[in-house]
């Protein structure tokens, strides 16, 4: 069981109410009462993830903080300073509530398949096509693997023609990671060695990068829904024990994000992404893949549901239903039609679906097939020949 206190602390996300934290860049929704109104679902979400949390204690501490918060918002000049001190004294009530994971929409029951070991690293190294930098835990490719890598990257972009290409920052502040409830120990901290430099992480193409441009955004009626964006390039994580195309700290990825006004619309987006990615890997690249709905214990904190497209136990792509969990924390809203006699004003927080495909892992499995005597698709062979 994972102790609750090991969950991410939200001091940067809640900097406005904590004091002495990082530069304030996020203004999350702090009215979390609706989360505690769904106690049964919250307990299921925690049990699924193997998290031990005293929900009643967290709720009581949060209620005390929120009561003070409401007084602070309505306070006059004479009492506002004292109430601000009380808010900071009761900060754990807010921080522990913000650390709670997303509720579970649905979870799969299939066990994680047995991972078939990969032989691509030894093969490519012997061919002089890959060099492993063990000190920095990265790999360097030359020759035809680079050609195939670039081809897959371009084809994944073409796979989602409705997604607008963007080039997000490769860096994200701690508050962004906390808004996504991501374990910061899995990311690479970055500094310029000055004492005043804010806590920042090198993330590359990732969920923090692709959501950051929309921080504190309010979409209007003129936007075409769903709003969708995509990016490709290097993604970065902290060091792992194994260094190869599937586990290096720098890997090539394709990321796509959909934002919708309707939770019901997410189902169609998820199904379409599953079909597109699965068909591309299976039919386009001749990889034998299976789509699996992940179990609750495999869900990331920001996910309410997730599917993985796997080849012999190796996850090549992940489709994540997020809902409005992240948008409430990054303050990404939409404004709809004004209220009428028959309907209420349609404002709210956007609903999200995120798809991340690991290009380097796909390349690794293609090389594994080659080692086993399986020919790659003809168009890949033709592209390789042209590169020489």
Model-derived segments and their meaning:
Residues 2-131:
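N-terminal alpha-helical targeting/anchoring segments
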Residues 34, 64-67, 110, 115-388:
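TRNA-recognition modules of translation machinery and tRNA-sensing kinases, especially anticodon-binding
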